[in-house]
UniProtKB/Swiss-Prot annotation:
Positions of disulphide bridges: none
HAMAP family registered for this protein in UniProt: TatA_E (MF_00236)
Assembly and interaction partners: The Tat system comprises two distinct complexes: a TatABC complex, containing multiple copies of TatA, TatB and TatC subunits, and a separate TatA complex, containing only TatA subunits. Substrates initially bind to the TatABC complex, which probably triggers association of the separate TatA complex to form the active translocon.
Transmembrane segments: 1-21
Main location: membrane
NCBIfam families: PRK00442.1, tatAE
Protein name, entry field: Sec-independent protein translocase protein TatA
Membrane topology: Single-pass membrane protein
Job description of the protein: Part of the twin-arginine translocation (Tat) system that transports large folded proteins containing a characteristic twin-arginine motif in their signal peptide across membranes. TatA could form the protein-conducting channel of the Tat system.
Pfam families assigned: TatA_B_E (PF02416)
Organism field: Pseudomonas aeruginosa (strain ATCC 15692 / DSM 22644 / CIP 104116 / JCM 14847 / LMG 12228 / 1C / PRS 101 / PAO1)
Family assignment from sequence similarity: Belongs to the TatA/E family.
Domain of life the protein comes from: Bacteria
GO MF terms held by the record: protein transmembrane transporter activity
Length: 82
């Protein structure tokens, strides 16, 4: 007996049918179905395009790393005046 019991869903469905009417709900259902079909078709064609393309080679880094040889120097901090 939660807030979304099956009885509540029946009441919500009746209110929606009264507000929108059965004809508008039928058109909405067919539009949603066509949208889902279009989405699936687009996903399937995109996957087919990926299968047709050869695997990409890993890219080379633009700047090759380089090492600088140097000696560390000791830095003395100035005395604090507290």
């Amino acid at each position: 007996m939660g807030i979304f019991d099956w009885k509540h869903w029946i009441v919500i469905l009746i209110v929606v049918v009264l507000v929108f009417g059965t004809k508008r709900l039928k058109n909405l259902g067919s539009d949603v179905g066509e949208a889902i079909k279009g989405f699936r078709k687009a996903v399937n064609t995109e996957e087919d395009d990926k299968k047709d393309q050869p695997a990409a080679q890993p890219a080379q880094p633009l700047n090759q790393p380089h090492t600088i040889d140097a000696q560390a120097q000791k830095v003395e901090e100035p005395a604090r005046k507290d």
